[in-house]
Amino acid sequence: MKIAVETTLFDFFVIDQFKKSTFSAPNTKVDTIKGCINKFIEQFNVYDEQHIFWQPPGKSNVRLLSNANDFGQLGNFLHKKIKCNIFIGEEALRKYDLNICGPYDKFVENSDPSVKKVVNRDDVMLSRKCLNIISEQLSILEKSISKAQNQVLQSSEVEGKKCIILPEDKPELIKFFSKFETSVQLQEVYEGYKVYEKLLQKFGGQKKRMESFLNENTPMSGAEAIKQINISEELKEKGERLTTPNDPLLHVEVSNEDNSLHFILYNKTNIIIPGNCTFEFSSQISEVFSIKMGPHEIGIKGQKELWFFPSLPTPLSNYTMKVVNQDGETILVGKCADSNEITLKSPLASFSTGSFQTGSFHTLQDPTNVFRADALSSPDESSIMSTPFLGETDEVYNSGSTLSRPFTWEEI
């Protein structure tokens, strides 16, 4: 059964390893799916055991769903309407000496003997009550979908005029649009939006750069503003041309939304970047804290995505960032100013031959594309792996390379 909600649709499956029970429910609201997953995590105590498997359709590499970053990747697949399976397999968990359900008697005690039937094959047991719990959680999801469907099916016309139904969980939208009573007022908003779009295009779609430009400059005419933007772009391009190819730079942009740090390290070189590095942050107004990159190397044209919740008492500002290798050597260092952008350079002669060339950290804070992970658990370093660049996923999956694609469990 497929239920259309807000013009888009995708399927969500939960399957046990023997495929005795399969449940599916369509939905488009990322928040609803995240809520269902959160309830699933709470029920299975995954915050302690942190082991669920998932994989895109047609791909052989099963992924470990264990931290906020992995939930974000799963959310992207679902948001793009790609069918995706979540596998809960005791056979696989036992093979890798992992655990998801905890002691089996936790799911069978204090229940009717007839309920204590389990799937038994090759000495592997999965409690049927465990599957029933999954079914209950998906029932909650279906009820939420039905409620959303009823809202969508409400009449979208009032006295022959078209209208827009605003979601009840977005009070800021309701407050904003309730101020407009005439088409003239909406036309003015539309004209302002076209100006905003044109200005945003001048900054290459980078909202932070545009906001920084508007905040740091006094009001000026449209012609002067465009002129200043062009000058700024020319200076930036000139500075980029003056940078030598062998200058090992990493450009960092850190966001403090949700009190989290979320960035990606790209390896655009022709060598492998070693693992077990540590990122150290320090400033005059906050304590020094460090983030471990994890044991996995970053392969050629690979990337490492990190998402952390350091619970900082104050936002990061005017801080120094160091990248320290496992021998305790600082291989990259730089200082962030008010612009919240930082250039890291290597103080070591061994890295002056262009081994890092150029790379960048990017924040991913778009709530329409990534799960907001403020309610999820802290990362498990063992699950941070080397993954391919965006746009190269299918090519890398189908290639034989082990440096720039997700690792299989056998390779780990």
Swiss-Prot record:
Chief site of localization: membrane
GO molecular function: protein-macromolecule adaptor activity
Domain of life according to the entry: Eukaryota
Protein location: Preautophagosomal structure membrane
This protein's UniProt keywords: Autophagy, Membrane, Protein transport, Transport
GO biological process: macroautophagy; protein targeting to vacuole involved in autophagy; protein-containing complex assembly; protein-containing complex localization
Region AMS1-binding, residue ranges: 246-348
Pfam families, alphabetized: ATG19
Membrane topology note: Peripheral membrane protein
InterPro entries named among the record's database cross-references: Atg19/Atg34_C
Cellular component annotations (GO), alphabetically ordered: Cvt complex; cytosol; phagophore assembly site membrane
Function of the molecule: Cargo-receptor protein involved in the cytoplasm to vacuole transport (Cvt) and in autophagy. Recognizes cargo proteins, such as AMS1 and delivers them to the pre-autophagosomal structure for eventual engulfment by the autophagosome and targeting to the vacuole.
Complex formation: Interacts with AMS1, ATG8 and ATG11.
Protein name: Autophagy-related protein 34
Species in which this protein is naturally found: Saccharomyces cerevisiae (strain ATCC 204508 / S288c) (Baker's yeast)
Taxonomic classification: Eukaryota, Fungi, Dikarya, Ascomycota, Saccharomycotina
The encoding gene: ATG34
